[in-house]
Swiss-Prot record:
Family the UniProt entry places it in: Belongs to the GMC oxidoreductase family.
Binding site for FAD: 7-36
Purpose: Involved in the biosynthesis of the osmoprotectant glycine betaine. Catalyzes the oxidation of choline to betaine aldehyde and betaine aldehyde to glycine betaine at the same rate.
GO molecular function: betaine-aldehyde dehydrogenase (NAD+) activity; choline dehydrogenase activity; flavin adenine dinucleotide binding
Catalytic residues identified in the record: H474
The protein's annotated pathway: Amine and polyamine biosynthesis; betaine biosynthesis via choline pathway; betaine aldehyde from choline (cytochrome c reductase route): step 1/1
Name the record gives this protein: Oxygen-dependent choline dehydrogenase
Cofactor field: FAD
GO cellular component: membrane
Transmembrane segments: none
EC numbers for this chain: 1.1.99.1, 1.2.1.8
Length: 565
């Protein structure tokens, strides 16, 4: 066993850990050890670097932890996929590259919780801007010199994108020119974490590339954190496995857990911090009985509403092996073409009922009919909407099953446990069908492939959801921030009752945000990095933002009325 000492030890080189490693080592007198269980982000591996290849990392275990849930009781007892990134970049190395920050009211809602007043939207917006370089330039909402490259969809891409946005507007919903700007609500172009050269903009590329050569940062890959070490109620270091060696590293200041919503509570529990009854089941000495560790687990569930496309404009030909070498060559040489996009270039957020204070349904539009992980491709030209509810009241948990750090934990999201879940998914299917019936899609829209136009009743739609809904890969909230009995960390990510230990990742969200989670996770890390460094917080923004204030969910009648059921 070998022993080393650093000021900070970061467990997990993902969306948050790479931010912290980069920001903390900007101070040359600070030493940081960054541990990552996976390997490097190989820049010549098209599976992680080509945006259009986003499905490939989910099909293996090189870059994916490939967790599975316990049988989900409300989803036909299916064991459901729970892919998380493994390697430098974490889940930003394998995600769908959709840059969505969430709704302003998500953060204003966080700030209504006691002790979280400094997490209001206008307090968070400066940190979103700090992290970002947007290709069309900065403004009150977007940054121009941050580590994360953000590309905005341009006119003239696949005609299905423009048609689907226009169909949403014809159905009576708003149009928005920026889902991360003044108004999230509505349909419009979607920002993506893609570089100007058409490469995935993971946090390994954006952040670590700035910091790799610093003498005060040591990055160790294939390093699996076993447990956090304590002296009384103070974290003093980490024991990790590196090859055949067990290594101990000591932290002079803090241990920073950035392992994500599944592995962060798993590491805490394995180290003796968590629900006492769970720890005693595995004969783990209890350092602190903290009941919220692993509880409050949340995710976004989504379904694919798929249609045949009457015109040959979908991405269906790109799925054929004989067309892929040309696509790959253009991407590799020029950074352009079909390979340079994740093809989630349009989407939207709507309220399905007037009394919803902010959007409860998200859309990703895709000009092909296929599962997110590349499976079940429809053998014809098609298109689809990924549709799901945003703030499910259902809550799950992550529970340790073994003291072995290689063993996966027990994961139960408890999807669709509440009546509101079912109402929102039925509403979403019916709203989507109405959108797809609008004149803008007449030249493209063929028959409905999924769920199938013959499924109309509540019971039929519920049966479809149970059998076909899937994760959107947004686990969060399992080490929530706050000050109630189930809170795990305070407003600066410090674990309650323990000195020298923080959790900084999507697990500390008190409530899941409206949209994808990569951008909010980066923001959280940027904000807490300033707290760790004892920097003055960035000046609060004075940007304006949209609040519905009871306005109708639709501004007008649909161009084409709903079909009679």
């Amino acid at each position: 066993m070998t022993t080393r000492e650093f000021d900070y030890i970061i467990c997990g080189a993902g969306s948050a850990g790479n931010v912290l490693a980069t920001r903390l080592t900007e101070d040359p007198g600070v030493t940081v050890l960054l541990l990552e269980a996976g390997g490097p982000d190989y820049r010549f591996d098209f599976r992680t670097q080509m945006p259009a290849a986003l499905a490939y990392p989910l099909q293996g275990r090189r870059y994916n932890w490939a967790y599975e849930t316990d049988p989900e009781p409300h989803m036909n007892h299916r064991r459901m996929e729970c892919g998380r990134g493994k390697g430098l970049g974490g889940s930003s190395l394998i995600n769908g590259m959709c840059y969505i920050r969430g709704n302003a009211l998500d953060y204003d809602n966080w700030a209504t919780h006691k002790g979280l007043e400094d997490w209001a939207y206008l307090d968070c917006l400066p940190y979103f801007r700090k992290a970002e370089t947007r290709d069309v330039g900065p403004n009150d909402y977007h940054g121009g010199d941050g580590p994360v490259s953000v590309t905005t969809s341009k006119p003239g891409v696949n005609p299905l994108f423009e048609a689907m946005v226009e169909a949403g507007v014809q159905a009576g919903y708003p149009r928005t020119d920026d889902l991360n700007g003044y108004q999230q609500e509505g349909f419009g172009p979607m920002d993506r974490t893609v570089t100007p050269r058409g490469r995935r903009a993971s946090t390994a590329r954006g952040y670590l590339d700035q910091a790799r050569a610093r003498p005060n940062l040591e990055i160790v890959t294939h390093a699996l954190a076993d447990r956090i070490l304590f002296s009384g109620k103070r974290a003093t270091g980490v024991t990790f496995l590196h090859g055949s060696a067990r290594v101990t590293a000591h932290a002079r200041r803090e241990v920073l857990v950035c392992s994500g919503a599944i592995a962060s509570p798993q590491l805490l529990q394995r180290s003796g911090v968590g629900p006492g009854e769970w720890l005693r089941e595995l004969d783990i000495p209890v350092v602190l009985d903290l009941p919220g560790v692993g509880r409050n687990l949340q995710d976004h569930l989504e379904m694919y509403i798929q249609f045949e496309c009457k015109e040959p404009v979908s991405l269906y030909p790109a799925l054929k092996w004989w067309n892929q070498p040309k696509i790959g060559l253009e991407w590799m040489l020029n950074g352009t073409g079909l390979g340079a996009s994740n093809h989630f270039e349009a989407g939207g957020f709507i309220r399905t009922r007037d009394d919803d204070p902010w959007p409860n349904i998200q859309y990703h539009f895709l000009p092909v009919a296929i599962n997110y992980n590349g499976s079940n491709a429809i053998e014809m030209h098609g298109f689809q909407a990924h549709v799901g509810s945003m703030r499910s009241p259902s809550r799950g948990r992550v529970k340790l099953k073994s003291r072995d750090p290689h063993a996966h934990p027990s994961i139960l999201f408890n999807y669709m446990a509440e009546a509101l879940d079912w109402r929102e998914f039925r509403d979403a299917i019916r709203a989507t069908r109405e959108i797809m019936r609008q004149p803008a899609l007449d030249r493209f829209r063929g028959r409905e492939l999924n769920p199938g136009a013959d499924l109309k009743s509540d019971n039929e739609l519920d049966t479809f959801v149970r059998a076909r809904a899937e994760t959107a890969f947004h686990p969060s909230c399992s080490c929530k921030m706050g000050y109630d009995d189930m809170a795990v960390v305070d407003n600066e990510g410090r674990v309650h009752g323990i000195d020298g230990l923080r959790v900084v990742d999507a697990s500390i969200m008190p409530i899941i945000t409206t949209g994808n989670l990569n951008a909010p996770t980066i923001m959280i890390a940027e904000k807490i990095a300033d707290r760790i460094r004892k920097h003055k917080p960035l000046e609060r923004s004075n940007a304006q933002y949209y609040v519905a204030n009871g306005a109708p969910a639709r501004g007008g009648k649909p161009a084409r009325a709903p079909a009679v059921v």
